[in-house]
Amino acid sequence: GRVKIGSRVKIGYFSQQHEGLHPENTLVGELNYDFGIAEEEARKYLGAFLFYGDEVFRRIGDLSGGEQARLAFLKLMLTGANFLVLDEPTNHLDIPAREAVEEALMAFPGTFVVVSHDRYFLDKVANTTAELANGTLREYEGNYSYYRMKKEIEEKEAAEAAAEKA
């Protein structure tokens, strides 16, 4: 098939490897470098992603994986993208950081597609679940738990139908 992306769709991508970060920059410096944001405004944004006080002057290369993930997510939000593709966004995150990401996504006015092994996270943020299997994409109108429930019903019905044919 073909996918046509609308002229007003701006795609943002969150990579679990955080390739878009510059290890030599400070957090404040990174926001200035990529977005031209001055220190005072950068501190406000960074605070919303749990970076406080002098932490904003740490080098990105010295951050933990979870801290880098939070910064990468902040940068993604600042791009103005209205369609997000998120590759394992909760990897390396502690509980407060994961909850901050959940809240940000639930408030996000656009569309997002998430690839994740974090079932709890998917239950919190997803309202549609897609399954790609055997070259077919199937859509389920619900979160991950709803998807699992529907799959169990389908599997049970398929097993019963097979037993009746035997």
Question: What would you call each of these model-derived segments?
Answer:
Residues 1-166:
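ABC ATP-binding cassette signature C-motif
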